[in-house]
């Protein structure tokens, strides 16, 4: 089936948005900036009010989150990216806590309405199909449920396969804009990150299926895998770090039980090299987040190794990955989806990896989490914990055993105080730690975060 595509302007397309509507924006590099700008122009002209904006992580400007649009646009994001972090922490914008796997369900079950989906797609092929490119995630569900779908057709959007392909008959308005996609570039891992990468790599077996995100620690892990064999990818996102391993044949997906020989992801962010890699590449499946992040689907592959990071971990194994004390820094994301999926996988390993200290010299391992900190991965879910000082297996360990193990990979300068807190709490661990916290909150200045997070970046 083919469809005659008629283009219009961004200004004309966004006229379908009404006051009170809920608008979805496609994610990461696929945020449709020309439509966003046209929507905001209507807001400035006083034509809109109480429009709710929903999205996952997006790159680029987020003008709708400017406080001048109070009463016009309300951001209710599914993830807090750097471009909306300050307004979310200030309380001007809001956040919907949700497992990444369930973001698509919010639209499909009607918990969050979707009146208008604003997306970015590839150039149509001869059959009238376009690709969602770098952002399938919850965007596919938004397209399926929206009253109106507005699409920016961009020749730079890669033609990705899997569930990324949609027919142009599903789209109501087309706008042409060939602005190059946003790119992400990462610095080389430092000494600490390299040490973490080596410890994680030692836990990865030949034939493992990997999940990891983007950034310094995932890149440090990937850099250590050149001697491995028959690795696979089933993840929520990937970036440049996987490409050398694909080119060398280390990543080939041959040991996977499902999607054999395929790399599976739901969104991605990287350099132009990554976008070129997935373009017209049948070895990459860009899938709905309800598939990629379903723990049951994840567990179907053997030796799933999920590597995720944290902002703070307490000595019982509670993992905070979304907030700095009471201030949201990112979001729940897909961490627990993959931690649980890996734990159900035959031979799987769920790994939490982080530097032992912040960049301000404060221990990220604490007797208890900072007040207000969110628990993303519970102490019941955590298996392996890794810092630059080593890797410890917490599975099946008692509270006291895991406390000793976690302390053993803390920075040496923090271990004595952490162990003292453990000893004082031994008689009644959780109640004891609360008592320790109240007596030792002054120690925050000397390197442990007990009482509160004084500044929003203390845990970074």
Question: Whereabouts are the PLM-identified features?
Answer:
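Mature, solvent-exposed C-terminal subdomains and processed small-chain segments of exported/organellar
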Residues: 317, 413-460
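Conserved alpha/beta enzyme-core scaffold
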Residues: 1-415
């Amino acid at each position: 089936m083919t469809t005659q595509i008629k283009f219009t302007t961004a200004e004309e397309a966004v006229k379908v948005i009404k006051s009170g509507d809920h608008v979805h924006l496609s994610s990461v590099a696929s945020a449709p900036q020309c439509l966003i700008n046209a929507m905001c122009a209507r807001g400035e002209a006083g034509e809109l009010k109480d429009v709710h904006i929903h999205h996952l992580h997006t790159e680029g400007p987020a003008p709708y989150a400017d406080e001048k649009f109070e009463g016009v646009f309300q951001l209710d994001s599914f993830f807090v990216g750097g471009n909306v972090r300050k307004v979310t922490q200030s309380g001007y914008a809001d956040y919907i806590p949700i497992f990444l796997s369930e973001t698509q369900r919010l639209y499909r079950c009607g918990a969050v309405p979707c009146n208008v989906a604003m997306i970015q797609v590839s150039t149509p092929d001869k059959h009238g199909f376009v690709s969602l490119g770098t952002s399938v995630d919850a965007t596919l569900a938004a397209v399926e449920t929206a009253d109106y779908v507005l699409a920016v057709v961009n020749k730079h959007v890669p033609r990705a396969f899997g569930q990324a392909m949609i027919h142009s008959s599903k789209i109501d308005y087309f706008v042409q804009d060939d602005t190059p996609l946003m790119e992400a570039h990462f610095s080389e891992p430092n000494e600490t990150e390299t040490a973490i990468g080596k410890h994680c790599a030692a836990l990865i077996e030949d034939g493992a299926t990997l999940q990891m995100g983007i950034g310094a620690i995932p890149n440090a892990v990937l850099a250590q895998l050149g001697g491995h064999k028959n690795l696979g990818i089933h993840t929520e996102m990937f970036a440049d770090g996987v490409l050398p391993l694909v080119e060398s044949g280390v990543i080939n997906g041959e040991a996977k039980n499902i999607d054999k020989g395929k790399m599976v992801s739901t969104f991605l962010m990287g350099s132009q090299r990554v976008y070129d890699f997935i373009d017209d590449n049948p070895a990459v499946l860009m899938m709905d987040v309800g598939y990629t992040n379903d723990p049951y689907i994840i567990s179907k592959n053997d030796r799933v190794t999920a590597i995720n990071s944290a902002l703070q971990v307490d000595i019982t194994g509670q993992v905070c990955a979304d907030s700095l004390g009471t201030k949201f820094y990112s979001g729940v994301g897909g961490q627990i989806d993959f931690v649980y999926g890996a734990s159900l996988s035959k031979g799987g390993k769920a790994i939490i990896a982080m530097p032992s200290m912040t960049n301000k010299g404060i221990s990220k391992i604490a007797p208890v989490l900072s007040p207000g900190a969110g628990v993303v991965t519970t102490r019941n879910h955590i298996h392996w914990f890794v810092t630059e000082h080593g890797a410890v297996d917490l599975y099946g360990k008692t509270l006291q055993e895991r406390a000793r193990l976690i302390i053993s990979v803390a920075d040496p300068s923090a271990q004595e105080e952490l162990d003292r807190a453990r000893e004082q709490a031994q008689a009644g661990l959780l109640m004891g730690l609360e008592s320790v916290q109240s007596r030792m909150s002054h120690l925050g200045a000397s390197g442990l975060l007990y009482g509160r997070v004084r500044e929003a970046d203390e845990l970074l």
